[in-house]
Amino acid sequence: MREVISIHVGQAGVQIGNACWELYCLEHGIQPDGTMPTQSTNEGESFTTFFSDTGSGRYVPRSIFVDLEPTVVDEIRTGTYKKLFHPEQMITGKEDAANNYARGHYTVGKELIDTVLDRIRRLADNCSGLQGFFVFHSFGGGTGSGFTSLLMERLSVDYGKKSKLEFSIYPAPQVSTAVVEPYNSILTTHTTLEHSDCAFMVDNEAIYDICRRNLDVERPSYTNLNRIISQVVSSITASLRFDGALNVDLNEFQTNLVPYPRIHFPLAAYTPLISAEKAYHEALSVSDITNSCFEPANQMVKCDPRHGKYMAVCLLYRGDVVPKDVNTAIAAIKTKRTIQFVDWCPTGFKVGINYQPPTVVPGGDLAKVPRAVCMLSNTTAIAEAWSRLDYKFDLMYAKRAFVHWYVGEGMEEGEFTEAREDLAALEKDYEEVGADSNEGGEEEGEEY
């Protein structure tokens, strides 16, 4: 089997994990206590990539929840799905990382890391052919940034060749949950850059807007946001959990989306996200949903791909979709002038089709639709997101604001400068990748 272990770190990671596993269970007909009613025996058993079978008719998620403080994980321990997870898969510390990368990475995180790696080792031993790890976390929090980067470093040591995909919550441009988010984000990006194979970014503000605009939710809660994020995660992982016409496996994402090791931050878009009232009046053909993927309104990160160039696009369809319609839709997109590809990657479309229609959480905001598409695109526009973050970092760091909290936890000030330089290099990498290849052919050689 090609198993995947999901690791949910910090409050954001754990709450997204909650939403994802709720959705997986609905998709596979697994009850909240892990049993599967006998009549719905799955043919193909593909879902065992994410669930392990205990042999006594119970299915346990191959996942781990880690937080440096207990309150968020306690909600799972006492919630609807408390019987689904093995109690050993919930690991919590006593004191939290206090939005401080250094606490998550050095002081508080150090005490938990060995327990976590031990549990991961047990899950890995239970797999016959472990394919890789899916790590969910936020950039802004102390645990999400600091502990994740520590974990990724250690996973590289223990499981060198296994792929590691990240699902990161990027700090929203307007809505901030912590003053030091820019510090944490840049430190964690710098540390995990060489350890992560592919990182899907999602920013809360973009999803707030989707909730308000498409779902008519006036004041979205984290539950609303996480249910949308879980649909995206579900689309990305659907091909590992179901049998489809064009299946995409973990390594295939990387092969098709990552042209250079550092340029591994695809932009996610998902359509259709509409409320039940609207769905009733819309047709939503394959070409409709494919086109709307290219609209900035449906993207999970605030940036404008019309200002950037696409390097690669991966379209993951699910539901009632036939390849012929997809080809027609893609051909139409290629003729549009607004959608530009870099000149060294002319074709650039990878397609996955899965016949399992999208599932929605009963009583949620999303309408049940016959087909949906998730688009993962590697575009130079995402550099906008980095430059925004770098700018905020610079404003604070010029005054050395809040730096003493990090240094007090055993970090050196040099790490800030080093991380900031690495991100400047990343912005430059994006710039060079987007530049036309016929300009300045001299200095090509030494970059990679």
Curated annotation (Swiss-Prot):
Q: Which family does it belong to?
A: Belongs to the tubulin family.
User: Where is there biased composition of kind Acidic residues?
Assistant: 429-448
Q: Does the keyword Membrane apply?
A: no
Question: Mind telling me which residues the site (Involved in polymerization) is annotated on?
Answer: 448
Q: Which domain of life is it from?
A: Eukaryota
Residues the entry annotates as binding Mg(2+): 69
This protein's UniProt keywords: Cytoplasm, Cytoskeleton, GTP-binding, Hydrolase, Magnesium, Metal-binding, Microtubule, Nucleotide-binding
Q: Which cofactor does it need?
A: Mg(2+)
List the taxonomic lineage. Answer: Eukaryota, Metazoa, Ecdysozoa, Nematoda, Chromadorea
- What are the binding positions for GTP in this chain? 11, 69, 138, 142-143, 177, 204, 226
Q: What happens when the gene is disrupted?
A: RNAi-mediated knockdown abolishes recruitment of microtubule end-binding protein EB1/ebp-2 to a wound site. Almost completely abolishes induction of nlp-29 expression upon infection with Drechmeria coniospora, or upon wounding. Severely compromises expression pattern and recruitment of snf-12 upon wounding.
Where is the region Disordered?
428-448
Described function: Tubulin is the major constituent of microtubules, a cylinder consisting of laterally associated linear protofilaments composed of alpha- and beta-tubulin heterodimers. Microtubules grow by the addition of GTP-tubulin dimers to the microtubule end, where a stabilizing cap forms. Below the cap, tubulin dimers are in GDP-bound state, owing to GTPase activity of alpha-tubulin. Required for the normal dynamic behavior of the non-centrosomal microtubules in the epidermal syncytium. Involved in the redistribution of microtubule end-binding protein EB1/ebp-2 caused by wounding.
Q: Name one Pfam family in it.
A: Tubulin_C
A single GO CC term, please? microtubule
Q: Which GO terms describe its biological process?
A: centrosome localization; embryo development ending in birth or egg hatching; establishment of mitotic spindle orientation; microtubule cytoskeleton organization; mitotic cell cycle; protein localization; regulation of cytokinesis
- Keyword Nucleotide-binding in annotation: yes
The family database entries (InterPro entries) matched by this protein are listed as: Alpha_tubulin, Tub_FtsZ_C, Tubulin, Tubulin/FtsZ-like_C, Tubulin/FtsZ_2-layer-sand-dom, Tubulin/FtsZ_GTPase_sf, Tubulin_C, Tubulin_CS
Question: Which Cys residues form disulphide pairs?
Answer: none
Q: What is its EC number?
A: 3.6.5.-
Tissue expr: Expressed in intestine, pharyngeal muscle cells, and a subset of neurons.
Chief localization:
cytoplasm
Which top-level enzyme class is recorded in the Swiss-Prot or TrEMBL entry? hydrolase
State what protein this is by name.
Tubulin alpha-2 chain
Subunit (UniProt):
Dimer of alpha and beta chains. A typical microtubule is a hollow water-filled tube with an outer diameter of 25 nm and an inner diameter of 15 nM. Alpha-beta heterodimers associate head-to-tail to form protofilaments running lengthwise along the microtubule wall with the beta-tubulin subunit facing the microtubule plus end conferring a structural polarity. Microtubules usually have 13 protofilaments but different protofilament numbers can be found in some organisms and specialized cells.
Provide the catalytic activity annotation.
GTP + H2O = GDP + phosphate + H(+)
